[in-house]
Amino acid sequence: MIREVSKIKYVYELLTPRIRGAIMSVPEIERDRIQEIRLRRGRRLSVTIFSKEYFVNDNGRLMNNIGDSVQVTTEDIETIYQRAFQNSLHSFHREIARGYITVSGGCRVGFCGTAVLDPARSYAVESVKNISSLNIRIALSLIHI
């Protein structure tokens, strides 16, 4: 028999206190099934569970509509982006060019923004500015029991 174990705990350190609080308030049985956390600047916090998107409020309630769900700010996006890159963007050129970085526990943080190209390197992606959204994919461990 195989059991899946979520590695969501590895992304808590990346999240801002407000976003972390909302995610940690989701009941554990649902929280462990989260596959993605979606953060879009100026839009509502959402999570994906079994390919279905839910919005999350401050109390961790999962909702099918926006309702009183948490609104993601520019500060949330910038802080989480910087934490994913350990405040050292210049050390991660390859990851920036790919559009995602693998963080602790095998989780991935994908990002969307405006590419800054380097003409000296055949217009390779040098950096990304104006980050507008982040998608955190939660890794799973398969445990044989």
Language-model regions, residue ranges each:
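Charged, amphipathic alpha-helical linker segments immediately N-terminal to NTP-binding catalytic cores
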Residues: 103-141
